[in-house]
Amino acid sequence: MDRREQKTQQAIRNAFLALRAHKPLERITVKELAENAQISKATFYLHYHDIYELSEALQEDVIQQILSSITQADLFVKDAPAFTRELFASFFAHQHLIDILFSGTQASVLPIRIEQGIREHIFAIVPERRDDAAFNIRLTYQVQGAYYAYSENQRRFGPDAVLAELDGITRSLYA
């Protein structure tokens, strides 16, 4: 990708994030985005099929950043409390983008995609866990349950208090 294409991509992404911060995904139009990015609609369509594809691409970027922040792909298997701390530290570091990209009708996308990504990492390393019911249920419970507990309570009680409680819950699960 040459420098012009990179600048256009960045303008599209910045315009989308600015619009998405104030509007539901379903109400953003290509025309409005193109005007804000100072590009033509045709230029937008050279890069993305529609607004939803752009949104998914930005969501995927955030998800990959979160997953790559986990120091060891098999940390969930080795040390579940440490895994929880790393995962939620990454959520906190990306909170601004999470609030924009995963709000409204997109709220459930993040924990589902994070869980899928973690499963892929774990099963590549420890394939025998794929059919382990207890392991799979705990993974879903830990990722989905902890995510919703965090997102519902972190603003009220602060991320440190929520993470400390999640750490205690995780430790009791594996005691």
Residue ranges: model-predicted function:
Residues 1-19, 23, 27, 36:
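Basic, helix-initiating cap at the start of DNA-binding domains
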Residues 12, 31-36, 44, 91:
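Append "Primarily bacterial transcriptional regulators
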Residues 18-25, 69-72, 94, 127:
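Basic, amphipathic alpha-helical hairpins
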Residues 21-25, 38-39, 45-56:
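HTH DNA-binding helix-turn interface
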Residues 29-30, 58-71:
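Short, basic, alpha-helical segments at the C-terminal edge of helix-turn-helix-like DNA-binding modules
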Residues 70-96:
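Hydrophobic alpha-helical connector segments
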Residues 105-140, 144, 171:
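Amphipathic alpha-helical packing segments from all-alpha helical-bundle domains
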Residues 152-175:
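C-terminal peripheral helix-coil segments that are non-catalytic and often amphipathic
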